[in-house]
Amino acid sequence: MNLDEFSDFNIDQLLGPSAPLQDALVAPYKQVSLPRSNQDVYAKRSRLAERIAQNDELIRQVKQLQAQNKQLADLQRTAQEVTDLYQKEKQQRIELEKRTKQIGERCGQLEKELDVQVGNCENLQEQLQVRGLPVEAKDVLSILMQFSQRLGDDCGLLRRDQNIMKKLREHCKTIDVSVPTPKSPNSRSKRKAHQPGVNQSTQTDEEPADPKPALCSVAVQVEGLIETRNQATQHKNTTTTRGTTTASFIKHHDVGTCFPEPKPLPNIRQILDEMLSWRDDVVIEPMSPLSDLQQELQLEDVPTNASVATCTTLCDIHREIDFVTDLPTQIKVSASRPPSRTMLDSVKEEARSSRELAKELFNFLPQNQSCLTNLPPQAFEELWQVFGQMVLALLQRRSNPSMATPPSVSQADFTRWLYELYEGTENQTEQTSNGSTSKRDFATSTECMDTGTDPIIQSPNISHEGHVTPIRLPSKPKERKRKSKKRKAAATPKPIAKRKCLEMETNNELEVEREQTPETAIQFLSNLETFNMANCDNLEMELDEEELYLLQLTSNAKQNENKGNVRVQDPDDLKSPAQTSKFPKSENHLPAVLKETASSLKGYDEKQCPFPDKTEELMHKKTFEIQENIGSLTELPPNIDISAYPVSMAEVRIVSSNKPSEMEVNASEGTDSHLDKSVSNLDTGSMSLFGSDSDVESEYSIEQMAPELSDSDDTFDNSEEDCRSADEPSNSKKIRNSSLFGSESESDESEERALEADDLTEAEAKVEEKESEQKSSDVAPAASSGKLLVVEADLVTKTQPLFVEKLDLENTQHTSTCTNPKETDESEDEHGLVIDEQIFISQPEEPPLTVPIAAKRRRTQSELKTLSPPGEVRLTRQRAKQLLDEQKSGPEKGLSLVEQIRRQLKKAINKSEPFKKDSTHDSKKDSTHDLKPLEHEDELKAMQLGTNFEPIKLSCSISEESPASPPACEPMDELDPPPIEIPLEQAACTRKDDQHKSIVQHVLKMDTGLEKLVEANRKTLGKSQPQLCASIGKYLQENMQLESTCSDLAMDIYKVTKSEAVIVNAMITVICKIGLDDGPVERLLNALKYLNFSQRFLAELEERLFRNTKERPATELALNYVRLYLKATALQATMSAGYENPARLLLAKILYHFDQDMPPLVMEVLRQFPTALPHREQREYDNSDALITVIKHLLMNRQYDMQDPNGAERLLLSKLRFEYHFQPYEPSKQQVLENLVGKLKAGREEELGYAFALFCRRSPHLKVVESVVGEHLMPLATSYCDLAAQNELYDARLGLLLHCISLVLKPLPLDTDISAFVGFLKRLLVAVPRSGVQLAAVKASLRLQRFGFKYTLDALKDYRPNYELDPLTRAMIRCFAKRRRHFRHVAATGRRTEI
């Protein structure tokens, strides 16, 4: 390249430093000719190229700045135009407002003027009506007179018209009106008036007709045999009320009328008698002869006054008792005492007055009702009196449990008295009634009683001068009649049982045993004490061949022992139904008392059999309990003699009642039947009351099931502690939003374990002590005649039932210290064991001893505890331990459990001597269990108390003379006491242990035995915590994001711990230290998604934000929590469907819990989720959520600090005003309240409780108790309560309303008076027995415990549910008991412990 061409350029100067630009222009330079220099031309060229490139870049930037400057100028101009337009529009609006105001004032003036003009117009119209007449009044008179003169005098006016004309003339003279002179008469103008003609008619008599002879058809017309009744008949209505038995009388009064009474049609014999009685000389006349009309009109009008007098001192009568109403009515409870002490302590449910219950109650009545018909009048009067007393006691039992007293007469005495009363007067001759009597029931008169008898009329009055005649019992019972075979077969069909027993008796003897006495209403009432159940469908117990044989074996124990010729069948034929049958889960959960009664009734008879019989599986419901109890023989130890444990449960009850300090052994003495129902439903997956209620178990794995079994069995060795520690990770997934502002309860699993351990330790210690006492005692144990009394209420602490389908001991594993569920059963529902104590059986060989009747123990309500539902076989803890020991050291472990039991029973049958010696020997020899007899223990306790208790013969669940009981071994003459009076009023004194404890009292009692409180769930690991945080921090700071990194993180974390709570807590701590950059947060969300921890992550963030009410987190830390929450919320929304607007709910919680730091947190939520609140112009937005109105009201009625231009409060208000276009102070609190109440009345449940709570807590200048609760919520609750008492359509709304009221009252000051609401809750628990309303009322009362535990205890003292509680209610009750125990501990020691 030739450089001569560039001689005019100074290259050195071009490559030198450039001069600074001035106004983005390059300064010109002068060309100077320089000598040519030999330099590096290529280097200069490159520098020149770089300088040119820089210049081009500068030129481009200049152009870009010029374009931006132009845009900025345009924007400024546009902004100025917008500002001018805004000012112009504002000025126009001000002018328009002024003009509008002026126009409005002008309109007001015009309206006033218009009113004046309207009034004037109306006056003018009235004047026009007066003045607009054609002539004046004076002229009218003259014109009228002129017209009369023109007509003339002979115009045919009537006398009335002439009198009027005369009066007009006189009036004209009076007022000086000139009357024109009459004109001359004109003959042509006269008109003749029409004269009325006279009509004449004659009336003649009708032509007389020949009389016709009276005819009648002999074959058709007969005299109706209708007896008439005079209304003067005396009627008597005996009414039994609470406290009094009264009789009301209607006095004789004659109303002068007789009316026919409906009678059945005459039979053929009566018609023939009437026809043959006719004679020729008798003139047959019609039945209704023609009567004269005048005679009928002249009948006397006899007054129909009735004089009614009632001789009574009624005591609070609220309802008729001699009929069942069609519709259920509200039962008003009286404070008066019940009328009789013969009522039953075991009655705990109020009789429901519904048609369905009436049908069930009266199913026991025979169809022909011949028994009641044949009763003589006096017997009917006394029985009707007793019936009223019993029904009233049923109605009073639930409402006034403190008035219950023990019955003064036993059930057997009452039964004997009834049969004596019935049979003693059965053969009396029936008297015919007079013509004025009638039957009570026209429809069934031909079936129920003979014609012409009325037992009510013939019976004497039971009331003498206002005093009630007492009922005296006879000294000895008479022989009862047996029910015929034909009638029994027609009454109740029974299932065909294909069973074989050992050497049964002849069929004739079996037929005698199977005969039963007719079941009547009186027998049903006498057995109410035993059959304490809501549904009485199976009252008439039918026994099949096997059951009858079992009863016969028991009753003839001595005879079998003396004969010694009992043959044993082949062992292959002895198959237990528990081995061959599968028990289906019962979906029809019967009431607790029904299940207990049915099970004890049949199990009592069957467990007396020395061995199980071969039976085929029967799935029918009536025999299902029999199969269950036969299968329950598998609960007995396989290597223990069946007679080793004789015990009299009566003595156990008497001793336990005299020594209250031993009640801790029987931990569930006061447990109500509802508690077993509330924890027995395994299908729902819910845990027991003291289980983990706030945690949701995702699946039942081997890791989770083994600790549960080990927790239940506290008699194992100390190695089970490892299993308990492994149970902590199971508390993983908390239910989100279980309460609005924090959790209602904490998990309390170790509390149950400690309680069960204490109970079992005390029980074992006492049993061991009594074994040593038994060895030193020479008194031979005496038992009743083979009556097995397994009263679970005395010896049972209930947890979850265990379904047993088949026991297989060959598959057990001996290496595990914590038993696997497969070791005890192979069923699907494997949970904890049920019974904490041993099961004792009585010795069936010894004869019963006679005792006075006063020593008989009555059946207390605490015995009425529920057994397993049909199809469930439950194992005791003692039995579980025996199974485990048998696996280790049992010599017969190769055999099945049923086969071992069968061999033991065969040995017991073949023995010819009593089992007492062998039982003592076996109990000493067997070291694997601690089953000991209790009779020596009872005798020693009786000696210490100075009382000698003898074995008592009891009726377990039926009367001693009922058809299903075995025949007595000895005559009952020695047991007959002198006649006992049955008083008609109860005494005021009651035993404390006769009453059911409420569920709250039971929970409090169960908690009293714990010495230490449950420590809080730990969320850190201690020494391993840094390692866990390092693993998480390393993962969050990695640059590479792969799927494998999440799996590596999971492996590293699970090496340290598997606790979800610990891992999530560490994640939050680490991410807050690292910072919320996009990379770490994204990796954290990926890890949460991979580990499926997002739900726990949100719960932990909420706990850190809102749980600690005294110390809130700092503003920056709270902002980090909110940002993380919103990120995780977006992740959760993508993972789960139906997750609607969680940001709005977070916004409500922030407003509820934060006051000073609220603006930055709300600002952060609205930045990330701007759709949490709607814009004012956004019409398509869903505004149905009640939280929207409340949040807008709270945000726009707050006083903001506008001093700091960059402050969060100023920015938040600007965002609300200019982005969402919210108006200041809108909506008002009245509008919000009306909106919330309207949604409540409409039944919309979307976050309504949250909205009420937030509104009443943060709304300024709001009178919560007076305006919100007093004026709106409580009246609405009262009306809903009345509606819910009638039907269940308003249950959901009433429950929601109680939820809202409790959340509103919860944060109020402690001096607030809430007694009115607590009283309403008490009324509601009684008035509405349905579970939905009652659970809402219970939760509402538990939320108000911060005002004092007395309010909650007072509201729930009578709450005894018979349904299963939901997990939240159980958790709240457990938390209430824990807090109460905590504060009592603080009050006693002065030291605070962590709850």
Swiss-Prot record:
Name assigned to this protein = Little elongation complex subunit 1
Q: Name one GO molecular function term.
A: chromatin binding
A Gene Ontology term for the protein's cellular component: euchromatin
State the family named in the UniProt similarity comment for this chain. Belongs to the ICE1 family.
The record's subcellular location field reads:
Nucleus
Renumbered to this chain, the Acidic residues biased-composition regions fall at 710-720, 745-762
Bias-annotated ranges (Basic residues): 478-489
Function of the molecule: Component of the little elongation complex (LEC), a complex required to regulate small nuclear RNA (snRNA) gene transcription by RNA polymerase II and III. Specifically acts as a scaffold protein that promotes the LEC complex formation and recruitment and RNA polymerase II occupancy at snRNA genes in subnuclear bodies.
What spans are recorded as compositionally biased (Basic and acidic residues)? 721-731, 763-776, 913-936
Organism equals: Drosophila melanogaster (Fruit fly)
Where do the segments described as Disordered lie? 175-212, 452-496, 561-588, 658-680, 707-786, 841-872, 908-936
Summarize subunit and interaction data from the UniProt record for this chain.
Answer: Component of the little elongation complex (LEC), at least composed of Ell, Eaf, Ice1 and Ice2.
